[in-house]
Amino acid sequence: MSMSTLRHFLWLGALLLATIQVSALPTAQDLICNGHPEYCDRRYSELSFVGAHNSPFVGPLLQHNQDISVTEQLDFGIRFLQGQTHKNDDGVFSMCHTSCILEDAGSVSSYLQTVKTWLDSHPNEVVTLLITNGDGLDIKEFDDAFNAVNGIKDYTFAPKSKLALGDWPTLRELITTGKRLIVFVDSKADTNRFPYLLDEFSYYFETPFSTTDENFPQCKLDRPAGGKPDGQMYLVNHTLNVNVFGIFLPDRFKAGRTNAAVGQGSIGAQVDLCNSIYHRKPNVVLLDFITEGDVLKAERTMNGL
């Protein structure tokens, strides 16, 4: 074989290899966003999520709200995580249930590290955190917790100004820009100082929490006080409680019924009620014991799948 012929074959081989490599790259049509290609070109504000209420508080005790860890919740398919914060007796900013004496699930930075580690290995997923500020601390405490987790702030979405409902990016845009972590705080947010820590009630209203009626017969605006639903996303607290001498405990025994996709007292039934009032489906439905019932089916139904 002559040298020119050999060079010709090598050139053809390189061209073929390059063609194969290019064809193997994911195209815009190949992208799957939060598990569904249908979600990619929907705005964040147009999607409905089921969320894990009190996501860090895991176990079999009366005060626990979930049965599986935060990582397992994400693996299960949950993309909206809520949790409470307080400072414990040692002054550590922690994920604590009502008080750190009742339940201390570790530092806020440890919780954030768990989320960041999961995001690292799931590049096509958008996750939302709703973190409550139980002690009314300066928002810098939250920023300090994020700063303690190397690289997590690279994922955070920080709009340049407050977004109207129709101005939110699509999941595709969030994924392709790498801004796949949306963070809301329920009080003391200051987006002039920390633009990625979004004020929950500038974007959402909520229905009442600590419900004890297993049929969830209402969907009224509870917070913020005096708020109006127009132009806001909204969050439904679909968590059933038992009142034990004035202490509200999650009702683990009825979780299968509460978290059913359809039927009386189900996710679907309350979503239908809310939709009849606000003429749009909830953006978030918060749930205890997310492995009970059929919560992901309910989420798909809310999103028209």
UniProtKB/Swiss-Prot annotation:
Active site: 53, 97
Any one Gene Ontology BP term: signal transduction
Keywords: Glycoprotein, Hydrolase, Lipid degradation, Lipid metabolism, Secreted, Signal, Transducer
Full protein name: PI-PLC X domain-containing protein 1
Compartmental location: Secreted
Signal peptide limits: 1-24
An annotated Gene Ontology molecular function: phosphoric diester hydrolase activity
Organism: Arthroderma benhamiae (strain ATCC MYA-4681 / CBS 112371) (Trichophyton mentagrophytes)
TM spans (from-to): none
Positions annotated as glycosylated: 237
Domain PI-PLC X-box intervals: 25-189
Gene3D superfamilies membership: Phosphatidylinositol (PI) phosphodiesterase
Gene Ontology cellular component list: extracellular region
Presence of keyword Signal: yes
